[in-house]
Amino acid sequence: LSVDYYNWKIKNEVKTLSTDQLLLAEYQCHNGLPNNTSASCQNVTDWVTRDAGGNLTRVYTPKLNVASQNLEAVTVGAKYQQDLGRFGSLMFSGNYTNMLKREVVALPGAQKLDLLSDPYNMWYYDNFAKVRGDVSVGWAISKFTTTVYANYVGSTPNYLAYTGRSYDYVHASGAKAGKWGSYTTYNMSLNYQAQDDLTLSLMVNNVFNKLPEGQRYNYPGNESTPFNDGFYSVYGRQISAQVKYDF
């Protein structure tokens, strides 16, 4: 059994300045206001190019050391093996991760963003689930080993929470922002040690062919992927075979 606590504080993180950020900085520099980047007004002037009529012709978006992050997480891992004598052995394994804090400051002087409570920025910056986990049970006997895996993704913001920037957002159609429930998929594998240097394997991912179909009602019809493809796969069940020979 292992329990770990992590606390990462990252400063001067490299970030690409966006076109919007630079155009806003240009406006601020021209009007004697503090600009919203760590770049000088001379840099901003060099990076934003306009023609004689003042029309925008080019914006150079450089990478600068501007962002900072604060992340806290706890992880728990466990492994156990039980000898069954002539019936082989059972292997158990499990991992759990809980994000306790996830804060981002995108630019110097900018507001600190709490990604755990802000569905828009949670999706925009990292696209993560607060809680994730996996468990596996394996059985080894003679030359055979079979394993069943379960992969767990905790609740995540739905699309309306992201676009409405709040879990309380209600669309004009009456559709409500909120969270998707937890999502679990199962994988299986079977290995046969034919020889000391030859292993045959059969693997099935997403055994029950689970798909994020329930999410599509929350998306507009013009979205190419009506689900959060950062977490969920549209491929469904996948079966593969492998022959491994060690030289």
Regions inferred by a protein language model and the residue ranges of each:
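Outer-membrane beta-barrel architecture
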Residues: 4, 77-79, 136-138, 189-191, ...
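Extracellular loop and loop/strand-boundary signature of outer-membrane beta-barrel proteins
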Residues: 60-65, 117-124, 165-168, 172-177, ...
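Residue-level preference for beta-strand/loop junctions
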Residues: 70-72, 129, 182-184, 196, ...
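Hydrophobic alpha-helical bundle architecture
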Residues: 176-178, 191-192
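C-terminal beta-signal and adjacent terminal beta-strands/loops
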Residues: 100-101, 149-166, 191-247
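Structural signature of Gram-negative outer-membrane beta-barrels, strongest in the C-terminal barrel
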Residues: 1, 6-8, 193
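Gram-negative outer-membrane beta-barrel transporters
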Residues: 6-11, 15-162
